[in-house]
Amino acid sequence: GDIYVSTDFMLLTQKKHGIDVSMRAALKTASGNDYATARYYDNAGYFFDTAAAHTFTIIPKRSEFILSASGGFLCWQTDNGRQNDAVMYGLRASYRYKGVSFSSEYGGYVGWEKEGDAPMTLKSTLSGKVGNIVLSIGHQIGFRDWPFQQLRIGFAVNL
């Protein structure tokens, strides 16, 4: 399997500057050494991105709307031994009311090789909190260079 290692830096906070801005640096390892298995982003790579978000409080401590955008740089090894570089982008809107949230996200990246390296996705997720358990269901649709759909059902336990 692959391993992601990342670190996030909070650059600005909404409380002090009117907007949350963070930066992330990440490294992705790969579990193979065969170039033939390097399809799209299945091999080792790294990325840097920056995200900005603003939270609009609708009902204090109960309801909020969050808008965010991100952009970055992605680099990975391809199946021909070269590396591909791409510009990453994303937009997200989410709404939270008490313990329930709904979010939609549009994003992807555009590489320079122009061969299977410009996927876009649209994801929507509904989640709810019951005690210390978070239940979620989501749907993801792929466009351009990622012609797949996913239905995601999950749970998390907050310790």
Language model features with spans:
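Outer-membrane pore/translocation modules
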Residues: 1-85
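Outer membrane beta-barrel transmembrane domains
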Residues: 80-81, 87-159
